[in-house]
Amino acid sequence: TSRPLKHKFAVRYPHSFDHGYEYGLVTADNRLLLGGWRNHSPTGEVGTYSIDVNPHIEEGLKQFARDHYDIVEEIDWEFSWSGIMAASKTGLPFIGPTTSPRVYACCAYTGHGFSWGHGSAKLLADIIAGSDVPAVARFFNPKAGF
């Protein structure tokens, strides 16, 4: 994620490139937030459990920003992080109570946390609050297992 930029972005909402393998958004304070690039890693990061930032991916995303955004100012990258990809058998995220008391899950986005995150958090909050939830929520049950 960059420091706030002066650049006037034409697209501020979440967007993706390369069939969703690279994605970005512009924050309210005009920072460029990018993610993805794992498909350019020799292993695709399959089987890795490290949360250390992969320099190949980080540099790839910085080059991606230079190649795909018409930003003339120097981009100062303030934040960088990594995460472990998780997937369920169905490819759908887990949202709801687990088999442990008072433990809930909101995970296993199969790399699509950008698109699933906000709605999943809302659904989990409704589940915890005991509010009515849509019938489709049963498909996200963590008790179904990985």
Predicted regions located by residue number:
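Alpha-helix initiation and capping sites
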Residues: 18, 55-59, 71
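Gly/Ser/Thr-rich active-site loops/lids in small-molecule metabolic enzymes
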Residues: 1, 51-61
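Flavin-dependent oxidoreductases
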Residues: 1-32
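C-terminal catalytic lobe of FAD-dependent flavoproteins
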Residues: 40-52, 63-146
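Conserved phosphate-coordination/catalytic loops
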Residues: 15, 55, 86
